[in-house]
């Protein structure tokens, strides 16, 4: 066994201070399929990966404690087809989501991207390669 055997990201856990709002965001705004739902653990399927939410504080194996003031949020990137970036932008605006950066081409990355935030202030990117 070695670290070279890692094949993919199985799941990502977002530590939440606003669990209800964040659950609603990923279910209702993003439209992700709810796989498991409890007060302390919510999982959505996103392709082969699970996006999981849990409250900050004591958990199954450890206590992350309160958010560190001034700490950076994470960035989650979700890949779509090139025409879908602009369609996602229109859908998010219609749902009242504040856009951090509207659809923009990033030639050095060969990406078209769109950025916004979830209720926990994590940066969410919708991107497409071109």
Residue positions per predicted region:
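Secondary-structure boundary/capping motif
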Residues: 20-23, 113-114
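Vicinal oxygen chelate
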Residues: 1-9, 33-81, 87-117, 129-130
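Short hydrophobic beta-strand elements that form part
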Residues: 13-14
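Short glycine-/small-residue motifs
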Residues: 123-126
